[in-house]
A protein has these predicted regions:
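Alpha-helical transmembrane segments of multi-pass small-molecule/ion transporters
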Residues: 1-318
Length: 318
């Protein structure tokens, strides 16, 4: 238990430090918290795509085959979480479509990089890194494109066109985005079986490493521009990410009879707090949601308790 607490302190304290730094910079006027377009372009078009490409391309095909059950469990758990949150956002809270989409992404796509990597590598070693890569793969190739299609479909330039044409155009536009093309290119590179040349790997890694810090700083910056809010929508988002998604994953571990570390990794990945993808996508499409940013912050805070509990549960799994 002391090991998990040490890993958590080393993982979550840096997350809150960078969030606080962004908040301070915006609140004190050091950085313009109303004009974040340049930071978002850096994230969405350069840093994040490089990180996603490497995260997928560095995985081996053999490992991908062994991780197939994990891929299935995470796809179902994350997909159901996204669907549930989207339904709540639209039908219960009556949130506009764009905000509903980015809010659902926040509540279903975990902070795999900033929290998942140190947590699972600290517990399971290199195998934990592969499990995290699977989580990123599911989010990047399933949840992100769905969200982008909704955002593109609701773009003001598309509003006057028939629904069918808007959907086709939105799908085409979303798959041209670097954040979707990059993991697809990484998957293609992986299947071809060519090792990434060292200079290319190091070059992409250099900019890719800035992703987490930039995303968390941007979130803090956006929080400084809007009041923090605790609403029914925020509570629902936290409930879905921190409790419902882990419960779904745990049920699927037993349904698919995942034994050993694979089942434990699937469960722990589902317990990770909300990630920054929703914030980044929202900033790109001018969707400024106080609730979305509040979910990210509170979900991370609550994970200080939920992750140790989940770890204790995981060690008793078959």
């Amino acid at each position: 238990m002391s090991v998990i607490l040490r890993i958590l302190s080393e993982t979550l304290i840096p997350v809150y430090f960078v969030l606080g730094l962004g908040f301070y910079a915006g609140a004190q006027g050091r950085v313009d918290n109303r004009n974040t377009a340049s930071i978002n372009v850096l994230l969405m078009h350069f840093a994040l795509p490089c990180s996603l490409f490497l995260g997928v391309a560095r995985t081996s095909v053999a490992l991908l085959h062994t991780q197939a059950p994990l891929l299935i469990v995470l796809t179902i758990a994350m997909g159901l979480s996204y669907t549930l949150q989207f339904y709540l956002n639209r039908s219960v809270f009556h949130i506009p479509l764009k905000e509903a989409a980015v809010g659902s992404l926040t509540s279903s796509f975990a902070n795999n990089v900033a929290v998942g990597v140190p947590l699972l590598v600290g517990i399971y070693g290199p195998a934990g890194l592969t499990a995290v890569a699977v989580g990123i793969l599911v989010g990047a190739l399933l949840l992100s494109p769905i969200t982008l299609v909704i955002l593109e479909c609701q773009d003001s330039e598309q509003a006057s066109r028939p629904l069918g044409k808007r959907l086709v155009s939105a799908c085409f536009s979303s798959f041209k985005r670097p954040v979707v093309l990059a993991p697809l290119a990484g998957l293609l590179w992986l299947l071809i079986g060519i090792k990434i040349p060292a200079p290319v790997d190091k070059s992409l890694d250099l900019i890719g490493k800035s992703t987490v810090g930039l995303a968390l700083f941007l979130t803090g910056l956006l929080l400084s521009a809007e009041p923090f809010r605790l609403s029914a929508n925020v509570l629902a988002g936290i409930l879905v990410k921190n409790f419902v998604q882990p419960a779904i994953a745990l049920a699927l571990v037993f349904i698919f009879v995942l034994r050993g570390d694979l089942g434990r990794e699937a469960f722990l990945l589902a317990t990770l707090p909300a990630g920054f993808f929703g914030t980044v996508f929202g900033a790109r499409y001018d969707v400024r949601s106080v609730e979305m940013n509040s979910i990210l912050v509170l979900s991370t805070a609550i994970s200080i308790v939920t992750i140790p509990v989940a770890y204790l549960v995981s060690i008793h799994l078959p």
